């Protein structure tokens, strides 16, 4: 997320003194300065990948369309009361810095070096977090996958085949409106075939995606990342497994339009070995009547009492405020570390077996933990069930997200004022 934060944004310093509206989007607008800055970031991204940069006029239309759809989602977030607290934002910024092996101060310095202010970066992260939550509420929470669907998938030839490999894909989507008539569908089909013929003649896939694709990943050259083939709509699910790396599919109609896929890479599966830790803990939470400092002191006192010989389980039953484990003496049983919050996982990883951790803080409160054991288990069966669940959820989510984005775009009032762009008002 947010690779663009490390791109030069010198364009923002060159914004004209008189800004202007390039699109009216329901109750908001997109400004020329926003468009210029985002176009510059995209140009930098493409250049860093070593690709040819499309004409600015082509990029402007693609970027403007993305800004319009982002704006609509942010307006939905505003109407829905979605807010990102400073604490949540700080935590997200910290995670981004950590992923780039930086401290916050190093992260600030890197941003300044690339011409981007820390406040601009925070605003960008906040917007992405709001959009993520809007999509979670409007799309992801509606996705349901039944146990029977998982069983059917695992029993199918397709399921057995696809769970053994992952595919790195890119796509080009020629969209069709939700209520498209036959003429619009035929026009989209012709455009898709034109793109396909250009690709067969050696045109660069990423550049064509940037110039022609209507997918929300167009500006990334259509890169979809790693996917299970079974996530994809038919007929691609079976077709891709038989393809060689570098091959492209012929255009096929999907609910969102006509799509062309390129197979960038493959990787295989094998047995799944999972590390598990047997751990117990005591959780003390701050409250209206107990301050953060008092909570920390209580956790320290409990640590001292356990170190002095008192029984961990009895103290957990008496003091722990984790309803899921307190009655079991704080025992979380054997657990996958990846299921735990990073703060808990990191302390647990550093604590030797049979020893206590010093009191530490997580988003839930203050903890003292004890590692009782470690093991590696063959979780192939469980992993395959989880993979099947993920594949089916992702397949449904991808289809629902594209449908929903197209729906909110079609239903919005949008007036494009960018010179040379197609005029639209709804």
From Swiss-Prot:
Keywords: Chaperone, Isomerase, Periplasm, Repeat, Rotamase, Signal. The PPIase activity resides only in the second parvulin domain. The N-terminal region and the C-terminal tail are necessary and sufficient for the chaperone activity of SurA. The PPIase activity is dispensable for SurA to function as a chaperone. The N-terminal region and the C-terminal tail are also required for porin recognition. It catalyses: [protein]-peptidylproline (omega=180) = [protein]-peptidylproline (omega=0). One of its GO terms (biological process) is protein stabilization. Its EC number is 5.2.1.8. GO terms for cellular component: outer membrane-bounded periplasmic space. It is found in: Periplasm. Residues 1-13 form the signal peptide. Chaperone involved in the correct folding and assembly of outer membrane proteins. Recognizes specific patterns of aromatic residues and the orientation of their side chains, which are found more frequently in integral outer membrane proteins. May act in both early periplasmic and late outer membrane-associated steps of protein maturation. One of its GO terms (molecular function) is peptidyl-prolyl cis-trans isomerase activity. This is Chaperone SurA. The keyword Chaperone applies. Residues 164-265, 274-373 form the PpiC domain.
